[in-house]
């Protein structure tokens, strides 16, 4: 799918991925920072609220502890610590306003005096109660953990302090406090319904809790999946499938006990603002991506215009009319400008090479046409030579008949000698004409050989030019391959350049294939030219032999003429001369027959040469057609 996308779309896709990745990283980082900030703010908030709540509880308890200490001091100063005086001290309004009850358990008798009065169970002995024994053991004011009152059955909290009168232990004075005030202090922390507060001891026992079912239970029972450690700070726990923040703040200044105010806040509620911010950030990211893509698309369209023009020019050369006159307009000095300059230089070199090949192809076509014309002329001359040779053969036959007639009729020797003289003169002229024709044929064959040799040399030059073209194609292919390798090393940023390099390499490969086809045609043309040269050389050799034979025939006809001229003076040796003449005529007839045979072979060779020249002309036309496919 990615291969079918254009380079600009790939850049847009990559940019979109980069922008989305960058904004995603920003959102994640900002979410992390916001989460940390919210957690820090939550910790600070819970710490401040916990400290304030612990301080309120501490202040409330310290005021009651001062009242218990004052009660103990008043009881210690009694002149007569009897029950009436003790009751009088316990009945003071300040105690009734701040305590549910105040009382004294005497050490000596176990008497229990309480105001307001409330009947205790039968056999009740204060000296066996925890508030009594713990205060006596500590020998100072203590605060007990909440417990169930033996008289009312209510959950209360007690403060007790040993009382000494005149150096002797009088008993332990104590005050009971109901937990409504502490519960009200804790329940005032609602956190808009997202949390609550409770009181816990350092041992993990829950002293006060909005859920009454958890009072006096341990944290392990309240948090079965993992109880938080009771140390100052904020902890994250899981309860009923939801995560909660739990902070512990110690209540300072309590003698004998260590209590902590525990604040619980729902984590999702604390992070609710983050969800809104995250949604807003995602929407902003989508808007930013769309806007950036639109702007980047327009910018890429402008920046990619040189590359688009380059691709269109390459397509015109590869699939259009092969117009090598087109050049790219260089408007910048960047990578596109460098690539455009390189493309223009490459097309310029191809243009010059094709132009030279075109000129050579035209010259080759012209030379081939000249060779064809010369071969046609040679064919006409060969026909004329054949006719002349037939005439000579007929004359020789007549000469032989005349010689036989001389032998049969010596009386008519002079007359026949005269006729023979005339015929010999005619034969000599024919032979001289034949010699001249053979010389002209030899010269034309020599010229044809020279032209074919020149044609062969030019085809070699064309082959050298094609070798240069093939070298250029191979070098271009190598450069394109190196460019593709460098683009692969550059990764996504170099894919567009890799596509261009691949197209250049394809063009170089096609140019190399065309050069190889032309090279093959030139090689076939060279083979035909060499065959034509060999044939013309053979024809020239036969022509020279024909000239030599014709010269010999001329010489012999001259001898015949001279002998016929002497017939009148040598009539006595007619018989002998006639026999010699017959032998010479037979020999001449054989020579003429051989000349005729050689002439026929020469005609056949010329026909073969003509066919080779026609093939040469055809190949030259094909080469010219291939070159004309380019616009130069």
Swiss-Prot record:
Top-rank taxon, per record: Bacteria
Membrane topology, Periplasmic segments: 32-279
Cell compartment(s), UniProt: Cell inner membrane
Membrane topology note: Multi-pass membrane protein
SMART domains documented for this protein: HAMP, MA
Tagged with keyword Transmembrane: yes
One of the GO BP terms on file: signal transduction
Positions of the HAMP domain: 301-355
Transmembrane segments: 11-31, 280-300
Region (Disordered): 408-427
InterPro entries, sorted: dCache_1 (IPR033479), HAMP_dom (IPR003660), MCPsignal_dom (IPR004089), Sensor-like_sf (IPR029151), T_SNARE_dom (IPR000727)
Compositional bias ranges of the Basic and acidic residues kind: 413-427
Cellular-component GO terms for this entry: plasma membrane
Record function comment: Chemotactic-signal transducers respond to changes in the concentration of attractants and repellents in the environment, transduce a signal from the outside to the inside of the cell, and facilitate sensory adaptation through the variation of the level of methylation. Responds to L-His, L-Pro and gamma-aminobutyrate (GABA). Also involved in repellent responses to trichloroethylene (TCE), chloroform and methylthiocyanate. Also mediates chemotaxis to histamine, but does not bind histamine.
Note: PctA has a broad ligand range and responds to most of the proteinogenic amino acids, whereas PctB and PctC have a much narrower range and show strong ligand preference for L-glutamine and gamma-aminobutyrate, respectively. These receptors are paralogs: pctA gene duplication in the common ancestor of the genus Pseudomonas led to pctC, whereas pctB originated through another, independent pctA duplication.
Name this protein carries in UniProt: Methyl-accepting chemotaxis protein PctC
Organism: Pseudomonas aeruginosa (strain ATCC 15692 / DSM 22644 / CIP 104116 / JCM 14847 / LMG 12228 / 1C / PRS 101 / PAO1)
């Amino acid at each position: 799918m990615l291969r079918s996308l254009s380079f600009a779309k790939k850049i847009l896709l990559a940019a979109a991925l980069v922008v989305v990745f960058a904004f995603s990283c920003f959102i994640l980082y900002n979410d992390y920072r916001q989460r940390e900030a919210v957690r820090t703010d939550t910790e600070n908030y819970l710490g401040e609220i916990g400290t304030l709540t612990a301080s309120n509880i501490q202040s409330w308890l310290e005021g009651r502890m001062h009242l218990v200490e004052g009660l103990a001091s008043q009881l210690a100063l009694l002149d007569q610590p009897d029950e009436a005086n003790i009751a009088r001290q316990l009945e003071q309004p300040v105690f009734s306003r701040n305590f549910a009850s105040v009382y004294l358990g005497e050490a000596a008798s176990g008497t229990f005096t309480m105001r307001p009065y409330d009947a205790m169970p039968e056999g009740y002995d204060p000296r066996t109660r925890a508030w009594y024994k713990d205060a006596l053991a500590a020998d100072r004011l203590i605060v007990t953990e909440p417990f169930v009152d033996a008289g009312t059955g209510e959950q209360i909290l007690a403060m007790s302090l040993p009382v000494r009168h005149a150096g002797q232990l009088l008993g332990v004075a104590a005050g009971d406090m109901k937990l409504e005030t502490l519960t009200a202090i804790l329940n005032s922390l609602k956190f808009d319904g997202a949390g609550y507060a409770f009181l816990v001891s350092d041992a993990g026992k829950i002293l006060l809790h909005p859920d009454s079912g958890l009072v006096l239970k341990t944290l392990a029972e309240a948090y079965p999946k993992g109880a938080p450690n009771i140390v100052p700070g904020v902890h994250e726990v899981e309860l009923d499938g939801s995560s909660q923040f739990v902070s512990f703040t110690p209540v300072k200044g309590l003698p004998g006990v260590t209590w902590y105010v525990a604040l619980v806040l729902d984590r999702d509620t604390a992070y609710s603002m983050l969800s809104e911010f995250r949604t807003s950030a995602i929407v902003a990211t989508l808007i930013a991506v769309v806007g950036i893509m639109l702007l980047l698309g327009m910018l890429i369209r402008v920046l990619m215009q040189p590359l688009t023009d380059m691709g269109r020019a390459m397509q015109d050369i590869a699939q259009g009319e092969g117009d090598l006159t087109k050049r790219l307009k260089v408007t910048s000095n960047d990578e596109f400008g460098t690539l455009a300059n390189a493309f223009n230089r490459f097309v310029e070199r191809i243009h010059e090479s094709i132009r030279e090949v075109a000129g050579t192809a035209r010259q080759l076509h012209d030379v081939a046409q000249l060779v064809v014309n010369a071969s046609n002329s040679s064919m006409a001359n060969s026909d004329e030579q054949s006719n002349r040779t037939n005439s000579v053969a007929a004359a020789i036959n007549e000469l032989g008949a005349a010689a036989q007639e001389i032998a049969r009729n010596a009386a008519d020797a002079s007359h026949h000698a005269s006729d023979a003289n005339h015929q010999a003169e005619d034969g000599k002229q024919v032979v001289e004409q034949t010699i001249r024709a053979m010389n002209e044929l030899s010269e034309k064959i020599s010229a044809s050989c020279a032209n074919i040799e020149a044609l062969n040399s030019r085809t070699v030059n064309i082959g050298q030019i094609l070798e240069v073209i093939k070298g250029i194609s191979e070098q271009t292919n190598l450069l394109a391959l190196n460019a593709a390798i460098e683009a692969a090393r550059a990764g996504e940023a170099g894919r567009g350049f890799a596509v261009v390099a691949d197209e250049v390499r394809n063009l170089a490969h096609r140019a190399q294939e065309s050069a190889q086809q032309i090279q093959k045609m030139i090689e076939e043309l060279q083979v035909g030219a060499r065959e034509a040269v060999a044939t013309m050389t053979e024809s020239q050799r036969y022509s020279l032999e024909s000239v030599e034979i014709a010269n010999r025939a001329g010489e012999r006809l001259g001898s015949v003429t001279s002998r016929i001229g002497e017939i009148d003076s040598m009539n006595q040796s007619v018989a002998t001369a006639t026999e010699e003449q017959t032998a010479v005529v037979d020999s001449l007839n054989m020579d003429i027959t051989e000349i005729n045979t050689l002439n026929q072979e020469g005609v056949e060779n010329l026909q073969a040469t003509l066919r080779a020249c026609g093939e040469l002309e055809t190949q030259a036309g094909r080469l010219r057609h291939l070159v004309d496919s380019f616009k130069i």
